[in-house]
Amino acid sequence: MEISINKEKALVVFSGGQDSTTCLFWAKKRYKEVVAVSFDYNQKHKLELECAKDICKKHGVEHHILDMKLLNQLAPNSLTRADMKVDEDAPKDGPPNTFVDGRNLLFLSFAAVFAKQRGINNIITGVSQSDFSGYPDCRDVFIKSLNVTLNLAMDYQFVLITPLMWIDKAETWKLADDLGVLDIVKNETLTCYNGIKGNGCGECPACKLRKNGYVEFKRLYK
């Protein structure tokens, strides 16, 4: 039996941060119809959902927010608990306390259920192995494994697409520049674990990675 894949539609897993926003505009260049889905897991940096909503509204992207607050009950971490301070540096052993067990597994699984109902095969996510910050669920091997599992679980042909998988933050900034959305990514996104839009707090690991990448981008490409 021939498998039919709709190449005109794509679903973007969209947090409102640098990486997923870059992926959103990457998708808009390649697909006729782009839908974005975000997840509310009671994150402290909840302003990211407002950023996601605003970006989608401004640029004509259909946007949905799914309730995933159950994840906060299952996996205590510094992104959801006010009494836990965000690790400023990666620990020597194990992932940092900003890692949310099962987050990408659950997000991509729920995104796949949503996509199937809409007749969408292509699911785009901004994970990167080059800058994976010690998060095991950002690795290429995980994405490939999950892609197979989702296809088997739902008897459907999903294609998990990772435009940033093998590029670093400097190259991600360059991609945003090439797409003509550098200012949008720089000013309208939220990457900061402490919930500060744009350049962020400058102290958390996400802000350091973002800033260092931007400095390197300016040095190499501008």
Curated annotation (Swiss-Prot):
The keyword Oxidoreductase does not apply. The gene is queC. GO terms for molecular function: ATP binding; ligase activity, forming carbon-nitrogen bonds; zinc ion binding. Catalyzes the ATP-dependent conversion of 7-carboxy-7-deazaguanine (CDG) to 7-cyano-7-deazaguanine (preQ(0)). This is 7-cyano-7-deazaguanine synthase. NCBIfam families: 7-cyano-7-deazaguanine synthase QueC (TIGR00364). It catalyses: 7-carboxy-7-deazaguanine + NH4(+) + ATP = 7-cyano-7-deazaguanine + ADP + phosphate + H2O + H(+). InterPro entries: QueC, Rossmann-like_a/b/a_fold. The keyword Lipid biosynthesis does not apply. It comes from the Bacteria. Keywords: ATP-binding, Ligase, Metal-binding, Nucleotide-binding, Queuosine biosynthesis, Zinc. Its cofactor is Zn(2+). Homodimer. ATP binds at residues 14-24. Pathway: Purine metabolism; 7-cyano-7-deazaguanine biosynthesis. GO terms for biological process: queuosine biosynthetic process. Zn(2+) binds at residues 192, 201, 204, 207. It is an enzyme of class 6 (ligase). Binds 1 zinc ion per subunit. Its EC number is 6.3.4.20. Belongs to the QueC family.
